């Protein structure tokens, strides 16, 4: 039986989760409910037409209070409080909390009260049972994990790389900069924002700001807890981001050893999660790439044997949404 999921919040991630399931033709998971405060016709329109990822690869129609996608009919509601969502009636196994609002275990657990058996938050979340980066630590999931976080798109990019390199040469300490496309958290023109950097026009500026993505790797890989930090620079592109990661190796290494370790992992245990490229690529080449992280081989630098710099691309929307799907299936199997 497929894992039955309900999506709360049909924004960039919510829509891409549904699209990822549809595009892959997955039969191990199905969306049975969507909750979003926008009109159902608006949600259907934004699913059909996407400025970043193009048209939805299939027919999307509105039938009363439901959206028809392919052969499936998905119930759509507009309810503010997650605890009153119809997850029990819809037989929801896993609720995907994609509003960006209910980002703590206490708040996200309202989906359990509504009848969902498990909850995945599409953002870093406080107090959750586990922070999951699929491919890195999803094997730690147990039936006792009821509310988990899917981490962030940036943590999903960095963690596979950090795991491979820590296993290969050891990471004493490291610092990441993510050059990140703008998101809906930023205005198109200057306006009031609690972060004065993010108050500035997204498409007109390179914007230094904060990120907890590097530190969060320690939640996924405890052996790296306290060893990583990072910052973000938001840039005027609508999608695709890149991490620039510098670290001090625990022993002397070479560019060939670093690249070789990543290539082996990408072709074996992390296939489909970690990719690599040997071409002189730019950001648009990775739009709609389902990998969590695509390592740029020609960007690896090593100084004095132990100071290492690497770079890895990620589609911050599409890769993350695909991992939400993978994690939901993994959790569903444990119910």
Q: Across the structure, where does each feature detected by a protein language model lie?
A:
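Short, flexible turn/loop "capping" segments at secondary-structure junctions
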Residues: 140-142, 198, 235-241, 302-305
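Catalytic core of tubulin tyrosine ligase-like
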Residues: 170-232, 238
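Generic structural signal for well-ordered, non-membrane alpha-helical segments
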Residues: 10, 14, 104, 151-154, ...
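Glycine-rich beta-alpha junction loops
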Residues: 37-39, 125-126, 152-154, 178-185, ...
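N-terminal Rossmann-like NAD(P) cofactor-binding subdomain of oxidoreductases
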Residues: 1-199, 326, 334-335
């Amino acid at each position: 039986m497929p894992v039955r999921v309900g999506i709360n919040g049909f924004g960039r991630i919510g829509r891409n989760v549904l699209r990822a399931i549809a595009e892959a033709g997955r039969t191990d998971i199905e969306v049975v409910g969507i909750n979003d405060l926008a009109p159902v016709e608006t949600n259907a329109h934004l699913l059909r037409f996407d400025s970043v990822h193009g048209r939805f690869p299939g027919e999307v129609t509105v039938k009363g209070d439901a959206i028809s996608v392919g052969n499936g009919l998905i119930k759509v509601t507009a309810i503010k409080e997650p605890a009153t969502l119809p997850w029990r009636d819809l037989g929801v196994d896993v609720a995907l909390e994609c509003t960006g609002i209910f980002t703590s275990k206490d708040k996200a657990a309202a989906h359990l009260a509504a009848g969902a058996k498990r909850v995945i938050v599409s953002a870093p979340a406080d107090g959750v049972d586990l922070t999951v980066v699929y491919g890195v630590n999803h094997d730690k999931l147990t039936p006792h994990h009821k509310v988990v976080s899917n981490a962030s798109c940036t943590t999903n990019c960095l963690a596979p790389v950090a795991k491979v390199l820590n296993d290969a040469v050891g990471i004493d300490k490291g610092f990441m900069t993510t050059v990140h496309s703008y998101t809906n958290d930023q205005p198109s023109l200057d306006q009031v924002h609690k972060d004065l950097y993010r108050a500035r026009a997204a498409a007109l500026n390179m914007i230094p700001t904060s990120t907890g993505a590097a530190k969060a790797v320690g939640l996924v890989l405890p052996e790296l807890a306290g060893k990583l930090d990072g910052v973000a620079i938001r840039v005027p592109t609508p999608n695709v981001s890149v991490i620039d990661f510098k670290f001090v190796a625990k022993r002397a290494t070479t560019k060939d050893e670093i690249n070789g370790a990543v290539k082996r992992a990408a072709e074996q245990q992390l296939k489909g999660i970690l990719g690599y490229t040997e071409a002189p690529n730019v950001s648009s080449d990775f739009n709609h790439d389902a990998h969590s992280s695509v390592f740029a081989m020609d960007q690896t630098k090593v100084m004095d044997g132990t100071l290492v710099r690497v770079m890895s691309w990620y589609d911050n929307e599409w890769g993350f949404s695909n991992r939400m799907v993978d994690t939901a299936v993994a959790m569903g199997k444990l119910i």
